[in-house]
UniProtKB/Swiss-Prot annotation:
PROSITE patterns: BRX
Compositionally biased residues, Polar residues: 25-41, 48-66
Gene name, Swiss-Prot/TrEMBL: BRXL1
Subcellular location: Nucleus
Primary location group: nucleus
Keywords attached to this entry: Nucleus, Repeat
Pfam families named in the record: BRX, BRX_N
Origin superkingdom: Eukaryota
Further details from the record: Overexpression of BRXL1 can rescue the short root phenotype. However, it does not act redundantly with BRX in vivo, presumably due to a much lower level of expression.
Function noted in UniProt: May act as a regulator of cell proliferation and elongation in the root.
Family: Belongs to the BRX family.
Consequences of knocking out this gene: No visible phenotype.
Identification of the protein by name: Protein Brevis radix-like 1
Length: 331
């Protein structure tokens, strides 16, 4: 009999479908594979990011560690370099507070270096100590009421006499010249004067303006050129307080003394407002500045250590060991 054409076509399609299924069972689907691979990569990435978050430091931990030692951190942040005067030949000056010494029950030792104002300070209990370079330092002494002398401390020891001022309320021109003539030798010996500052010696004549309060009286010739000059002991220490009002030494020629009135208005440089201050060498490399107050008491103004003999730690140790002795001996 004849075969149906439609049936033949359907049979052919069935065979083709069977062949496709056979191929599909042996070859993986490309989309399925890509999707599976993408899922695996995402899983790995999520695991990696999770472990990274666990090892990440907590916020603020680093900043808290930086401030674990606040004293050290503060000191390190406040140290400008290098030391005063641009010289490293000496250790930093100890400025002492303007008050009488009081014992403190707790030690408070703190080193702070300041260079460029240039100063290194140490504070021990109730006083601050500064280590300074061995450069010349000016200081003023009230020899007696109305007489103030400005000195410059010399690195090699002794003092340079820079200026003498007399109060107009106590001295006129001739009284001042007479006083200087009578007291010159005593001043040289008392304050261990090694030389005079010649720049301050020649001054103009006296002005008649009464608003000018003080005069400067200086010697014209250097003391080293004087026949009467003798080298003084570098270890001589001027005593504290006022010295006797009259001292009759060899008179000086009035022509060797000149006077001048200062042009500036009255200020703290006026003799009636000044306070006596002097420097004593306690031991080699240790210089102590003492001030005489108007009520007769003394205060410790400054302790200086030479860098050639003292480092910071050595200076601090020395001050802690000798503080009580210094207060008792000089105040």
């Amino acid at each position: 009999m004849f075969t149906c054409i439609n049936c033949t076509k359907m049979a052919d399609r069935g065979e083709e479908d069977e062949e496709d299924e056979a191929r599909g069972s042996t070859t993986p689907n490309t989309k399925e594979a890509v999707k599976s691979l993408t899922t695996q990569i995402k899983d790995m990435a999520s695991k990696f990011s999770g472990s990274h978050k666990q090892s990440k430091p907590t916020p603020g931990s680093s900043s808290s560690n930086l401030r674990k030692f606040p004293d050290f951190d503060t000191a390190s942040e406040s140290v400008p370099y290098p030391y005063p005067g641009g010289s490293t030949s000496s250790t930093p000056a100890w400025d002492l507070p303007r008050s009488s010494y009081h014992q403190s029950g707790r030690p408070d030792s703190r080193f702070t270096s300041m260079y460029g104002g240039e100063r290194e300070s140490i504070s021990a209990q109730s006083c601050d100590v500064v280590l300074e370079d061995d450069e010349p330092k000016e200081w003023m002494a009230q020899v007696e009421p109305g007489v103030h002398i400005t000195f410059v401390s010399l690195p090699s020891g002794g003092n340079d006499l820079k200026r003498i001022r007399f109060s107009r309320e106590v001295f006129d021109k001739w009284q001042a010249q007479r006083w200087w003539g009578e007291n010159y030798d005593r001043i040289v010996e008392l304050y261990n004067v090694q030389r005079f500052n010649r720049q301050a010696l020649q001054t103009p004549g006296r002005s008649e303006d009464q608003s000018q309060r003080d005069s400067t009286y200086t010697r014209i010739d250097s003391a080293r050129e004087s026949r009467d000059w003798t080298q003084r002991d570098n270890n001589f220490r001027p005593p504290g307080g006022s010295v006797p009002h009259h001292f009759y030494g060899p008179p000086m020629d009035a022509a060797r003394i000149t006077t001048s009135s200062r042009d500036e208005p009255p200020s703290m440089s006026n003799a009636s407002e000044m306070q006596g201050e002097w420097v004593e060498e306690d031991e080699p490399g240790v210089y102590i500045t003492i001030r005489q107050l108007p009520d007769g008491t003394r205060e410790l103004r400054r302790v200086r250590f030479s860098r050639e003999r003292f480092g910071e730690v050595h200076a601090k140790t020395w001050w802690e060991q000798n503080r009580d002795r210094i207060q008792t001996q000089y105040l």
